[in-house]
């Protein structure tokens, strides 16, 4: 038995990069690859992807099979305006919904989109929580 959390995270990053069709592709990366705090190119949006949780459930006889449920957060940031972050959010949701079935995974689901604009000044932020399910990684 192994963990599926980083496999799911890498799949999400590569999927967003390869299937982006709405204008210029944002800077998409895992959160630990972002080297600076507080600095962002105000002309290009940023999407940070990070793992939140992995739960492992037993199913099958005698614990022979395991279902891994991995929660991933996709955090979109923009300095443009509300319309721009709304378009970025719609593109993220479009990509995830178009890829419900992923190779190597049971499925990929949108759990909850959350606006966090009220916490910041001069920056728009939206978080989409997604869930991967995989058996016996």
Task: Mark where each language-model region is.
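Oligomerization/assembly interface segments of phage tail-like spikes and tubes
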Residues: 64-80, 124-136
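Extracellular/virion structural assembly segments
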Residues: 63-67, 77-97
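Short, low-complexity, polar/charged sequence segments that are solvent-exposed and flexible
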Residues: 50-52, 66-71, 91-95, 130
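Acidic-leaning, charged glycine-interspersed low-complexity segments
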Residues: 18, 22-25, 35, 42-46, ...
């Amino acid at each position: 038995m192994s963990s599926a959390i980083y496999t799911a995270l890498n799949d999400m990053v590569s999927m967003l990069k390869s299937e982006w069709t709405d204008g210029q592709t944002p800077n998409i990366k895992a959160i630990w690859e972002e080297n600076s705090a507080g600095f962002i190119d105000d002309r290009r949006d940023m999407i940070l992807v990070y793992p939140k949780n992995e739960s492992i459930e037993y199913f099958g006889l005698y614990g022979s099979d395991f279902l891994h449920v991995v929660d991933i957060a996709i955090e979109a940031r923009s300095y443009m305006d509300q319309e721009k972050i709304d378009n970025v959010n719609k593109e993220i949701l479009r990509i995830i919904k178009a890829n419900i079935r992923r190779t190597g995974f049971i499925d990929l689901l949108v759990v909850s989109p959350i606006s966090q604009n009220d916490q910041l000044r001069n920056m728009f932020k939206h978080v989409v929580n997604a869930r991967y399910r995989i058996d016996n990684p």
